[in-house]
Amino acid sequence: MSQWWKEAVVYQIYPRSFYDSNGDGFGDLQGVIQKLDYIKRLGADVIWLCPVFDSPQDDNGYDISDYRSIYEKFGTNDDMFQLIDEVHKRGMKIIMDLVVNHSSDEHAWFAESRKSKDNPYRDYYFWKDPKADGSEPNNWGAIFSGPAWSAMSTAQYYLHYFSKKQPDLNWENEAVRREVYDLMTFWMDRGVDGWRMDVIGSISKFVDFPDYETDDSRPYVVGRYHSNGPRLHEFIQEMNREVLSRYDCMTVGEAGGSDVEEAKKYTDPSRHELNMIFTFEHMDIDTKQHSPNGKWQMKPFDPIALKKTMTRWQTALMNVGWNTLYFENHDQPRVISAGAMTRELRKQSRQSISNSSARHEGNPFIYQGEEIGMTNSEMPLEMYDDLEIKNAYRELVIENKTMTEEDFRKAVAKKGRDHARTPMQWDDGKYAGFTDGEAWLAVNPRYQEINVKESLADEDSIFYYYQKLIGLRKQNKVIVYGDYRLLLEEDPRIFAYIREYRGEKLLVP
């Protein structure tokens, strides 16, 4: 198979917030089709489409109830097939989100599984007896707050690493793995060019379900047992043999709990697993992830720590695996915070951030709106829609009282996922040109000064800076394939490095 994906620039679309074609306030597939020429103009080669499958939308589509049907608000299967065709007509490719660590609790598999202990689908999920006192089988926590176990009428608990409406699939069951490979084949046979695999690092469980040892008062813990289970790489290698190896495709795994040594296992071509993974390490520089308050416990940003972290990933995977290059996506806030930053400072900030990674080795991932400098939004707590924020508020502020409401509000203003999910700002009209109806989530109030129309009219805009960076990458193999060496390691003001490839050197100041 070719390695076309190494030279690709990826544009991520969060479809419910991208463009609404029918005025119902909810982005859709026809809206994506209408904006493909804009993405092509930027210079992207691949579109990553966040989940559009049928779903109750408890977690905005990351809770799938039917993997072969499109959610009605997004459109139909025919709309999806048309989108695939239109992307290919423009010389681009499209990858979809594969969410198979868990399904929705409204999936037919779970509807059967919950009926009785002897149901044929029972082992599609993890069911365990309670402890002697009737409590959860262990002290594992859910990433979206609370316990990772919920009880059902069959007197057992089922496992869910995220929301209770997202029960974890049992990858130990060969029938489950076959279901996954079949659904992947269904879409790849219809032209999908690859997958971004949601929390793929969690599909293998520690099936003895040990309790975490903890020295604090937390009743539930999220930690090392939540990822990198004993059969993880066995499962991914099997997926590669059964499906991926039959297609000339791009594969990206979300593996937030992985260090560089684990990343080598995923991405070393000789192991036949994935092309690359997303790591979160560089995104957690300003948070105390392992504190009782998790990502909401802020700490001062350390630019030297960022440089060292990114350099460690560059050098560890050099000539072994491959990196992803990103600072924004649907799970991360905007890099540029809301506030009084002037237009010129915003532009300089965005250019500096893109310079620090876009010329590293790996695939650049651009999240919708990043290319025009969209910022974090400004909204009161009650206006946030995200399940993660609502659950964390209840747990940390109301129940555990480990954060004050004001401290939590400040943390959400910096780290909330909804900042990335506000509607795409196309122009300075009502609802930023996203919809003719009422948008499903409040539009960022800065849309009148930050929008696509304004960006395209300004030849010195962030959009055109990104376009030039992409063009440079396409014209210079040293940016794609060159070795990496950091300069001025201890200087907090300068992130400079050298790339070198076949006698050519590039200094990035």
Swiss-Prot record:
Its EC number is 3.2.1.10. It is found in: Cytoplasm. CDD domains: AmyAc_SI_OligoGlu_DGase. Its main location: cytoplasm. It catalyses: Hydrolysis of (1->6)-alpha-D-glucosidic linkages in some oligosaccharides produced from starch and glycogen by alpha-amylase, and in isomaltose. GO terms for biological process: oligosaccharide catabolic process. The record marks 331 as: Transition state stabilizer. GO terms for cellular component: cytoplasm. It holds the Pfam family Alpha-amylase. Keywords: Cytoplasm, Glycosidase, Hydrolase. GO terms for molecular function: alpha-amylase activity; oligo-1,6-glucosidase activity. The active site is at residues 198, 254. Belongs to the glycosyl hydrolase 13 family. This is Oligo-1,6-glucosidase. It comes from Bacillus sp. (strain F5). The gene is malL.
